[in-house]
């Protein structure tokens, strides 16, 4: 979570909008993020990274409904119209991306080949919770790898905070506009922040 916050904050400081939506993404399904703090006494919300908002850039984080296809479709369109922003959609559990498979198949994996549309959207898919029960343990990495063709998208599995930090920053700074599918072992991605500079 620290590497993620550092990546977001550094992009905001460089005048890039950062946007994330998904079920329970403000807190993080596994209580790893805490991007939005809730005051227990009065119910008010505090989002520390909003302090870095200036000019036309903004940090926006939205808890969305369990309507994966519609939310991912909206975020895909937002990313298409905001090519300099870091736009992310997080599945509460990686399996929940099943509900958005049509968006992945028709747009994320194929829009560049079909319509010459380039997009930098990031899919954050928690992965690897063996024993967590059906529909809660696998982001189906093989499904995304099977969709890879002609450099249409990037599929990564960062194993250190530094790798995740650099992947998010690279998504905004690289000249190539490709969707990024990021399979995250949230509970195991804890380490020193070496390499985050």
Task: Report residues per predicted region.
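Residue-level marker of positions within ordered structural domains that often coincide
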Residues: 79, 149, 191
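Phosphate/diphosphate-binding loops
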Residues: 91-93, 99-101, 105-112, 117-184
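Non-catalytic terminal/interface segments that mediate subunit docking, oligomerization
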Residues: 1-84, 89-112
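Short intrinsically disordered, low-complexity segments
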Residues: 90, 193-194
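Conserved small/polar residues in nucleotide/adenosyl-binding loops
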Residues: 185-192
